[in-house]
């Protein structure tokens, strides 16, 4: 079994906290789509994993551009007719050839990063262009997982995973043929592995904490909230109760009630605990 880089696990926690998603959701999708591999070495650079879809490219071209792309084997009206090379370096070279014909159409025809989100979704995910979406993916694991989070939220898919409706998620994410791909089984197994990875990987000291975080840092946060007079379970799992208590604390202290234990909130909690000592 491939080892998962701590960078990806921490990115899932950060993005999950920022987007109010359990990090298991982001990790599970990444495990199925890219084995949670955030980067490949391409020409000495760290680049996100990509997959080029020639039928998307074909639809986004017309006239001479489409003729050139088809003649070069870069575009086809049929899905799967343009094969993806095995290596990421070769895929990036293919993308470069497509971009020489039409950069925006080429970037819209690629699935990007850990969650393999299509560049074609750039507008509904809040980007100015497909190139801007690609730049977000190329910024690092956080950017890639943020793309995944935006897509899951836009499609109302995250709740299906949280509810462990793996078949319902697979149908929406992978298509009606999901059983042939065993996508429901894959995402269920990935969910269990993501859960175990988060349990086994401690939260980095000083990291922001949000829904889905767990471990000693969450336990300490819950104890501090309890000492501050907020009723909640002290169990090391950041769920609805912890979020509600944290929002109440933030409102009381004049902080933005985000429900995320950021640096300012943690400092306020630490200050309150220090002030309570005799």
What are these language model-derived features?
Residues 57, 66-68, 76, 83, ...:
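Polar low-complexity intrinsically disordered regions enriched in Ser/Thr and small residues
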Residues 2-208:
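Catalytic glycan-binding domains that act on GlcNAc-containing polysaccharides
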Residues 200-207, 268-278:
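Intrinsically disordered, low-complexity Ser/Thr-rich linker and spacer segments
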Residues 163, 209-219, 223-271:
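Short acidic, glycine/serine/threonine-rich helix-capping segments at coil-helix boundaries
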């Amino acid at each position: 079994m491939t080892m998962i880089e701590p960078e990806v696990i921490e990115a899932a926690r950060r993005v999950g906290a920022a987007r109010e998603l359990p990090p298991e959701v982001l990790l599970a999708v990444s495990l199925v789509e890219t084995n949670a591999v955030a980067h490949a070495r391409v020409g000495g650079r760290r680049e996100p994993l990509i997959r080029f879809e020639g039928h998307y490219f074909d639809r986004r071209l017309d006239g001479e551009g489409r003729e050139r792309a088809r003649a070069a084997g870069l575009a086809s009206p049929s899905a799967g007719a343009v094969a993806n090379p095995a290596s990421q370096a070769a895929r990036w070279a293919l993308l470069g050839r497509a971009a020489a014909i039409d950069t925006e159409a080429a970037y819209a025809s690629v699935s990007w990063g850990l969650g393999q989100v299509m560049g074609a979704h750039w507008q509904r995910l809040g980007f100015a262009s497909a190139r801007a979406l690609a730049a977000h993916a190329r910024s690092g694991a956080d950017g890639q997982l943020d793309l995944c989070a935006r897509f899951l939220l836009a499609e109302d898919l995250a709740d299906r995973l949280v509810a462990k409706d793996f078949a319902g998620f697979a149908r929406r994410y992978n298509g009606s043929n999901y059983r042939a791909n065993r996508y429901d089984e894959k995402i269920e197994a990935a969910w269990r592995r993501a859960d175990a990875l988060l349990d086994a990987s401690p939260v980095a000291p000083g990291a922001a904490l949000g829904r889905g975080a767990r471990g000693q840092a969450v336990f300490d946060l819950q104890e501090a909230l309890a000492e501050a007079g907020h009723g909640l379970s002290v169990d090391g799992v950041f769920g609805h109760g912890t979020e509600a208590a944290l929002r109440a604390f933030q409102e009381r202290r004049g902080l933005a009630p985000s429900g995320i234990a950021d640096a300012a909130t943690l400092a306020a909690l630490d200050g309150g605990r220090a002030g309570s000592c005799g």
